[in-house]
Amino acid sequence: MNIIEKNNIDKNHLKKNLLDLLKEQFNIRLQLSSGKLKKTHLVKKNKKDIARIKTVLNKRINHTL
């Protein structure tokens, strides 16, 4: 999902996605530290997805002020 599509999603759905990504990030970091993670690119991808969602949410907050 790109940034334009994320701009059109409602706030509650974005927050749910953010929570899911944060849980996934936790699991990825656990696997990475234990040496079981085979797909190391997921660390970077997950981090960027979290940043994109936070950016959209912050734009909405700042735009309403």
UniProtKB/Swiss-Prot annotation:
Keywords: Ribonucleoprotein, Ribosomal protein. This is Large ribosomal subunit protein uL29. Belongs to the universal ribosomal protein uL29 family. GO terms for cellular component: ribonucleoprotein complex; ribosome. It comes from Buchnera aphidicola subsp. Cinara cedri (strain Cc). GO terms for biological process: translation. GO terms for molecular function: structural constituent of ribosome. Pfam families: Ribosomal_L29.
